[in-house]
Structures are given as C-alpha cells and as structure tokens.
C-alpha cells in the first residue's frame, strides 16, 4: 500500500474508561525445566498474558502485541529455565519494557506435571499428575511472583462418620459388649463416612521469586486431605487408602487449616509479606452440591494465627 494505515488502536475511545487487563489467553508453549544432574522436565504449558490499558487509548495493537508476546515467551522458554515462576517474571518485565503506555504486565501459566511414585502398600510404580500454577505481575515498583500446585486427594466427612460410630456403639451396647472394648474397637476400626474427591490448591506469592519448592507445596496440599489417592491401586492399596482416609476424617475447613499449619512450619525462612493462598473444593458423593473453603493471607498474619492456636 502507498499510504500509511491509520493506527486505530492508538486513537481515543468513545468511552474513556481504563482497562485493568487486555491481552491473550490459551497460548501453548513447550517449557523445559532444567534439573541438576537429572533429566529435564518438559511441560506443555498454557499462558495468559495481559497488560493494562489507559483510558485514553482505544486498544493494545492486538496483532503487533501478539508478536511481541510470542517473541518474548519464545525467548524465555528457549533459554535455561529452572523455576517457572522466574520465567513468568521475566516475560512480565519484558512486556512492561516494550509497552510505553502500560503500567502493569501480568503473566499466568498452568501446566500438568507427571511425577513417578510407588503405590502405598503394594509398592508398585505408578504416576501422579499435579497442576502447576505460576504467575508474575510486573510494575514500576518491582515484580511479584507466584508458584503453587493444585492436587487431588480423598476426604471423609467427620459428621457422617460420627453418626456411623454412634450406631455401631449402640448395637454393641445391645450385645452386652463392655464399654472399654467398644471404644477400643471404634478407635482401631474407623467407622464409615461418606467420602469426597478433594481438590486442593496451595500457592505462595512474594517479591521477586518465592523461595519455595513446587513439589513440597504439592506434598503439603496432598497431605492436608484425609488420604492421598493413586492412579494404580491393587487390593492392599485400596485397603490402605480407605483405612487411612477414615482414620483422618476432615471437613474442607480442616484441610485448609492443615495446609496453613504446615506452611507456617515448613517455610520459616519466608518474609512476612509473602502471601499464601489455600483452597479446598470437595466433590460431594451424597449431595448435589459441593463443599468449598479458602483463605488468602499474608504469612505474617498466618503465623500469628497458627501460633495462637
């Protein structure tokens, strides 16, 4: 074309309202995570990338912006990556540099990570999938990064279990079994309760890069539920999972509080201004609704609450 096309995106909008996030979603990239002395992990990661838009600008130059985003992501993922949250931070900072009209750049990444483990009783090799959650927000004041995981486990309802134990106690009383024997039996043989598949999410956000291990976060979230679950389960494994879940029945509230306690105990080195996000959602087995509990809190406040328990 012989003439310059108008830059519509740079024009003034009819309604001068600023937008907090404008960008692209569902951007798939291969990410290779280097590990000292071990085979690198290769992830198919999905990115969401946003910048803010001032009130006097109509748009973000979507096509050109996508090229910038793609080049920036490609440069980040093609290099040596040891922490995905640092990679997100690098992308966010580069985007902030390349957009003179923006004050905030946000990058979010999700990916599935497959881990090798053994079943709890039969000790057979199997695989476990955890969802990696990483993000970063860059501003002129600095960059905050988030890392965490979403995992699946099993919970048992304490209320339902309590009713079953009460019924068992009444039956044994009617059979003239001594109280001490009844209580010993109930202690050693947890009574049935309705179960749920639990979805636990645990993330930590801090200035720069949170000094936490992704796998440790996943383990804390898994162990906060009544029991871990496994893709492969022979009969001894099914018995193990069922027994241990019923021996540690928990509400969704209990799961979040278990995460809170373990985070405080495990990450004493983190600064007080780190933010912890804990979430538990359970798929109910006997209800048409599901159960949910969550908390987002600074580590300073969480430490104070846990120490007061």
Curated annotation (Swiss-Prot):
Keywords recorded for this protein, A-Z: Hydrolase, Iron, Metal-binding
Coiled-coil regions, chain positions: none
Catalytic activity: GTP + H2O = 7,8-dihydroneopterin 2',3'-cyclic phosphate + formate + diphosphate + H(+)
Pfam families in UniProt: GCHY-1
GO terms for MF: GTP cyclohydrolase I activity; GTP cyclohydrolase IV activity; iron ion binding
Positions bearing the site annotation: May be catalytically important: 157
Subunit structure as annotated in this protein's UniProt entry: Homodimer.
Function summary: Converts GTP to 7,8-dihydro-D-neopterin 2',3'-cyclic phosphate, the first intermediate in the biosynthesis of coenzyme methanopterin.
Descriptive protein name: GTP cyclohydrolase MptA
Gene designation per UniProt: mptA
